Amino acid sequence: MIFHIFQIDFIYSFLISFIMLKNLDEITSSIIADPQNKDFTERGIFPLFSAPKTARINIVGQAPGLKAEQSRLYWNDKSGDRLREWLGVDYDYFYNSGIFAVLPMDFYYPGYGKSGDLPPRQGFAERWHPMILGNLPNIQLTILIGQYAQKYYLPENKDNVTNTVKNYRQFLPHFMPLVHPSPRNQLWVTKNPWFEEQVIPELQILVKQIINKD
């Protein structure tokens, strides 16, 4: 089992303890007011994440895409359709059951670069995830989608995404690493048939067990 001690800047930790941020509304307001997010806030763009107190499964991806930013709905694209297929749940259950938390590595769309969406901003997850997770006592499984989530939550793991996903059992029962469900990764899925033959069925069993647990 790989454990991760979240590293938070000392000064910021002091400020947070001083102003006593406790609930999600306060945390969300603090994210919006953070100078790091000033450009987004001034444009009327607000952090995109979901953290119902009843959540049992936490999904950590890269960052919202442009479509998610525009629609104000995370995983609202073909990647989301495939993710729900992998999880074995439908659209309504994914968004409305209260079972799933969605905490990407950045809560804002970082923009587009030469090879696709830019990476999440450094330090964002370190700053906000621990506080939010402190409000989610029922998380039983964290699904880590892509290299940024895996590097942060599995700091002792030095493998690339393919090998990390292939060796997923060593991270269970707390973490399940996945490749990104983007259609652009279909070639990867085709070249690695073990993923849909072995990983996805086991993921669906885990999700079903967690959903049905009293």
UniProtKB/Swiss-Prot annotation:
InterPro entries: HI_0220.2 (IPR047124), Uracil-DNA_glycosylase-like (IPR005122), Uracil-DNA_glycosylase-like_sf (IPR036895). Pfam families: UDG. SUPFAM superfamilies: Uracil-DNA glycosylase-like (SSF52141). SMART domains: UDG, UreE_C. Belongs to the uracil-DNA glycosylase (UDG) superfamily. This is Uncharacterized protein HI_0220.2. It comes from Haemophilus influenzae (strain ATCC 51907 / DSM 11121 / KW20 / Rd).
